[in-house]
């Protein structure tokens, strides 16, 4: 099934964003684990896998529309050197995803591609949850202070 070239461009742009997020979250999770924040690392790793599922769905859609998924391009990774920097970097990429998705949904509807629009809407719903989580973590860090917040992210050894 031949897809609209503009819709295929938007799908590949969103694929690039998701592939970038996968790498950024995965590296952040490995760093968090290395720092001893194992519970936080597990959550961040799961977010990386959520982004992978988005990339898979976008890839499937591109292929169905007879397009070629571009896995060779990534946006710049923002790797935080502290938990706060990581949350801020992850939040920035989530805001960028939303800034790209909302006009893309409108264009897909204009092009009569409701399936791609629905896919993008599902991704928006997932990203809204992640934005809420990241904003909450930054608020907690501000309220508790970095040290107390960080202490909450460490797994307790089994007794």
UniProtKB/Swiss-Prot annotation:
Question: Which residues make up the binding site for heme b?
Answer: 52
Keyword presence, Ion transport: yes
Q: Does the keyword Transport apply?
A: yes
In which residues is Fe cation 2 bound?
51, 94, 127, 130
Q: Which CDD domains match?
A: Bacterioferritin
Q: Which family does it belong to?
A: Belongs to the bacterioferritin family.
How the cofactor is bound: the record states: Binds 1 heme b (iron(II)-protoporphyrin IX) group per dimer.
Residues reported to bind Fe cation 1: 51, 54, 127
The EC number(s) attached to this protein equal 1.16.3.1
**PROSITE patterns, sorted:** BACTERIOFERRITIN, FERRITIN_LIKE
Q: Entry's InterPro entries? A: Bacterioferritin, Ferritin-like, Ferritin-like_diiron, Ferritin-like_SF, Ferritin_DPS_dom
Name of the protein described by the UniProt record: Bacterioferritin
Give all residue intervals belonging to the Ferritin-like diiron domain.
1-145
Among the GO molecular function terms of this UniProt record, one is: heme binding
Cofactor annotation: heme b
Reaction(s) catalysed by this chain's protein: 4 Fe(2+) + O2 + 4 H(+) = 4 Fe(3+) + 2 H2O; Fe(2+)(in) = Fe(2+)(out)
Source organism: Mycobacterium avium
Keyword annotations from UniProtKB, A to Z: Heme, Ion transport, Iron, Iron storage, Iron transport, Metal-binding, Oxidoreductase, Transport
Self-association state and partner proteins as the record states: Homooligomer of 24 subunits, arranged as 12 dimers, that are packed together to form an approximately spherical molecule with a central cavity, in which large amounts of iron can be deposited.
Question: What PANTHER family does the annotation carry?
Answer: BACTERIOFERRITIN
